[in-house]
Amino acid sequence: MIPYHDLLERILSDGAEKHDRTGTGTLSVFGHQLRFDLAAGFPMLTTKRLPLKAIIHELLWFLQGDTNIKYLHDHGVTIWDEWADANGDLGPVYGAQWRSWPTADGRSIDQIAHVVDMIRRNPDSRRLIVTAWNPADVEKMALPPCHCLFQFYVANGRLSCQLYQRSADVFLGVPFNIASYALLTMMVAQVTGLKPGDFIHTLGDAHLYSNHLEQARLQLTRAPRALPAMAINPAVTDIFGFRYEDFTLHGYDPHPHIKAEVAV
């Protein structure tokens, strides 16, 4: 995960001081890209421990089209609690846009089902895109999508994915996002009969919050370890058929967790 450490170093050395919505303050750079070959290992950060259970359950929750935190709570995941209302609702966030994008004539579009079908039928298409950024719904969302658009690409029997993230909390959010979209790429590859290719992560405003700077410096003192391997139940052929038990991470030997507060 050297590319991630390079990003931390770039922000600490070149980042501009900026004010932000949360009032915390950031060091920020604009425009950065990370690339991971999924055949070389699962890109799960090793210089601090990440919560695999939360990563998997959040992704499954998105794929269900769910926007209430009850499913997450039922599985011990609390990462969305700060933004939910008293009933646990978040408004039309990621899952709603992925699975039921509203059209002007009252229909809805299941973008995930559509893109999987397109990969199978027309893998050379340049329209293999899913977007969560819906201008008509942004004001109704508890938190507008940070990772807002992703595109698939098929070549030589391998499926790659590029994510555009408009706002990137580099210490807390980005490691989580890398693992989540790498896993999604592997899942889509499996159900479409392809091998995983590259995951490319393109960042817009890539920032470290001012209360994460010391944690980032600590992390940079740690040497990256060998990447783990993700095993997925090969019997699953439906993108909506995956369960938590279908995923096993082998060889994950990270450095200890580094505590940092979420900016809300």
From Swiss-Prot:
Keywords: Cytoplasm, Methyltransferase, Nucleotide biosynthesis, Transferase
Positions annotated to bind (6R)-5,10-methylene-5,6,7,8-tetrahydrofolate: D169, A263
Active site per UniProt: C146
EC identifiers of the protein: 2.1.1.45
GO cellular component labels: cytosol
Associated pathway: Pyrimidine metabolism; dTTP biosynthesis
EC class name: transferase
InterPro entries (UniProt xref): Thymidate_synth/dCMP_Mease (IPR045097), Thymidate_synth/dCMP_Mease_dom (IPR023451), Thymidate_synth/dCMP_Mease_sf (IPR036926), Thymidylate_synthase (IPR000398), Thymidylate_synthase_AS (IPR020940)
UniProt record, GO biological process: dTMP biosynthetic process; dTTP biosynthetic process; methylation
Signal peptide: none
Compartment list: Cytoplasm
Sequence positions that bind dUMP: R21, R126, R127, R166, S167, A168, D169, N177, H207, L208, Y209
Domain of life assignment: Bacteria
GO molecular function, one term: thymidylate synthase activity
SUPFAM superfamilies reported in the protein's UniProt record: Thymidylate synthase/dCMP hydroxymethylase
Reaction equations catalysed: dUMP + (6R)-5,10-methylene-5,6,7,8-tetrahydrofolate = 7,8-dihydrofolate + dTMP
Record-linked HAMAP family: Thymidy_synth_bact
Family: Belongs to the thymidylate synthase family. Bacterial-type ThyA subfamily.
Function: Catalyzes the reductive methylation of 2'-deoxyuridine-5'-monophosphate (dUMP) to 2'-deoxythymidine-5'-monophosphate (dTMP) while utilizing 5,10-methylenetetrahydrofolate (mTHF) as the methyl donor and reductant in the reaction, yielding dihydrofolate (DHF) as a by-product. This enzymatic reaction provides an intracellular de novo source of dTMP, an essential precursor for DNA biosynthesis.
Oligomer and partners: Homodimer.
Protein name: Thymidylate synthase
